[in-house]
Amino acid sequence: QYFIGLDTYTTDLPFNHSTLVYFRRRMGQITELVRNIISDTLREQIQSLLPDDELRVLITDATAVPIEIRFPQDTSLLNQARLNLEEMLLDMAHQLQIKPPRTYKREAKAKWTAFARKPRRWAKETRKQIKGQLQYVRRDLRYIDVLLAHGASLNERQTKRLAVIRELFDQQMFMYENRTHRVLGRIVSLAQPWIRPINRGKAKQRTEFGPKIDASIADGMIDIERFDFKAFNESQDLATTIDHYFDVHGYYPDEILADTLYRTRENRQLCQRLGIRLSGPRLGRKPKKMDAKQRQVDRDAEKRRGKIERGFAFMKGPLGLSLVRTKTVASIAVTIDIAINLANLKMLLRLFNGPILIFVKYKQESILIHYQIHVSGSRNVT
């Protein structure tokens, strides 16, 4: 209580748990400033401690940050939308002091329960269930429009949810009529409509649900170049990443380490024009005979590029980015920023792990403390 600014001891709670949420949001507004202060203040010291193969080198890559949501299915999304609409209709009927309109919710619940209990669902049964749910949702939306016209109202949360349900209904109706499973801007969660599916093509999971970030490493410090909930091609951001490096350092990097997705013709021409060496072979057919020395250079560059992959693994492991459990856009962004700052702090502790001496004097008593920070592995930081 003393360190948070209270003058006297009290048995009352100084704050509740929601206060920490607002505190983290305030931290999110200055995380980029903190990274800039660290890099500007300690750049010369960091560069003096880094190996030569990491100086004037820019490493860039992209990854997705999974969000904890229920795996989206068309039938479950429509059933949840139907339940939300029934609650809205009941509230609006109470406002107008009229009898709630008939929604056939008992029949809809019985059909949904019978369908959800089946361990294996055939395509015809799923399509039939989607058709029924679409009919229930369309009827409820029509009732809501009528009650709104008669003077009923919805609160802010219900108004936002109604807009999401209308968009979900249009998407599901389009996919049902066209017999497809693809639609632009597909909604996968009613509570978090900003989340979009990100096709990653990984062996473990082909599709991930969460924001995609384009990150870079310069002088050992990780920074975010782009943050978006929609899928994007990170190769188109290489020019912006190079400009960001120039704005921070005042010169262009000598070498860029990136995977094959970045080695497009436009990016290679850009790097050649700026005098930057882009690691890795060119895209297209491999030559019949390749110089052994060049092959070794490409192999070494790929090993050095693995540093950013190890950074992603550290952030998704001990720092918890493998599954983010926060709900709002701001809290998700703050969680990612905090993880990146902690990863940078770990790197700084590894570089500046010299002995520290603290001298404390209190009431004519002197205490001398000697300690040293040791960083071992990726999980134990003491």
Predicted regions and their residues:
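Flexible loop/turn segments at secondary-structure boundaries
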Residues: 196-198, 222-224, 231-233, 262-267, ...
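Helix-centered, glycine/charged polyanion-binding patches within enzymatic domains
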Residues: 260-330, 334
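Electropositive, glycine- and tryptophan-enriched low-complexity nucleic-acid-binding patches
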Residues: 2-4, 194, 202-248
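A short, flexible helix-boundary coil/loop motif
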Residues: 295, 318, 322-325, 348-382
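Short, conserved catalytic/metal-binding motifs centered on acidic residues
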Residues: 16-20, 56-66, 215, 238, ...
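Active-site- or DNA-interface-adjacent structural scaffold in DNA-acting proteins
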Residues: 6-192
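Short helix-capping/linker segments at secondary-structure and domain boundaries
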Residues: 71, 221, 343-356
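Phosphate-backbone recognition surface of nucleic-acid-processing proteins
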Residues: 2-22, 278-280, 286-293
